[in-house]
Amino acid sequence: MDRLYHPAPSRTDCADAAVLRVRGGIVGAATQSDRVAEETPVALEYNGISHATMLASPADLEDYALGFSLTEGIVERPADVRGIEIVPQFNGIVVQVEISSACAARLKTRRRAMAGRTGCGLCGVETLPEVLRQVPTVADAAPVPLTAVLHGMRAMRGSQALHDITGATHAAAWADAEGRVQLVREDVGRHNALDKLVGALARQAIDPRSGMVLVSSRASFEMVQKCAAAGIGILAAVSAPTALAIRVAQNTNVALLGFVRNADAAIYSHPERLRLRP
């Protein structure tokens, strides 16, 4: 069977593919059309110098560039990013980011070439200190009701439009202190989805201390690290955290929750950031 792929007419982040389905062990009589997620090489350039190439969903790339710049410590504040330009290429997308001269000088001292696989986040990191880099401790804030976290996670599931179409993407959502989902970003890579969300928060001037981040994936240490770098004090994941994620959360004053499903959750760090009982 010939495999035919072409972009879906209404979206850039998914495409149509011909598929021969098997149901109950029986092969279908004819091919059907299926929607699949796009996965595109996205190269980030800072002040004209190539810095990282990741595989990502080709949507919300301005959010991604700003969020990546913040969570990776390339810039300290959104104002350090002077401009973002999306430049499509025949074999991918180049995102040209202009940053302040002070940030550019600092970046040169810690430059690394990261060739990522679906937002793996570590490919090309040259030294252990670059992996476990220091990030600020998140400031204390008023406790958020645990019921709001549970409500937010349920609400996020109904807001994953790209996942509903393709079944192939992760989501990162921002919910306020009452569990109302305000923003959702999706990507084939869970780190990319989180970076897009952080960038969207920054572009909309939303205080990261005023709510929580919910993710449809496991919680790796990089996810905790990125939240701490953005000043986000609560990270709730639908799946498990890693041991290193828990240690990073403990050290950065981040409340880390795993297995947040329906009315269940496991709280691994800083339960004082949550109001556990009505």
UniProtKB/Swiss-Prot annotation:
<keyword id="KW-0501">Molybdenum cofactor biosynthesis</keyword>
<protein>
    <recommendedName>
        <fullName>Sulfur carrier protein FdhD</fullName>
    </recommendedName>
</protein>
<dbReference type="GO" id="GO:0006777">
    <property type="term" value="P:Mo-molybdopterin cofactor biosynthetic process"/>
</dbReference>
<dbReference type="GO" id="GO:0097163">
    <property type="term" value="F:sulfur carrier activity"/>
</dbReference>
<dbReference type="Pfam" id="PF02634">
    <property type="entry name" value="FdhD-NarQ"/>
</dbReference>
<feature type="active site" description="Cysteine persulfide intermediate">
    <location>
        <position position="120"/>
    </location>
</feature>
<dbReference type="InterPro" id="IPR016193">
    <property type="entry name" value="Cytidine_deaminase-like"/>
</dbReference>
<dbReference type="InterPro" id="IPR003786">
    <property type="entry name" value="FdhD"/>
</dbReference>
<keyword id="KW-0963">Cytoplasm</keyword>
<comment type="similarity">
    <text>Belongs to the FdhD family.</text>
</comment>
<dbReference type="GO" id="GO:0005737">
    <property type="term" value="C:cytoplasm"/>
</dbReference>
<comment type="function">
    <text>Required for formate dehydrogenase (FDH) activity. Acts as a sulfur carrier protein that transfers sulfur from IscS to the molybdenum cofactor prior to its insertion into FDH.</text>
</comment>
<dbReference type="GO" id="GO:0016783">
    <property type="term" value="F:sulfurtransferase activity"/>
</dbReference>
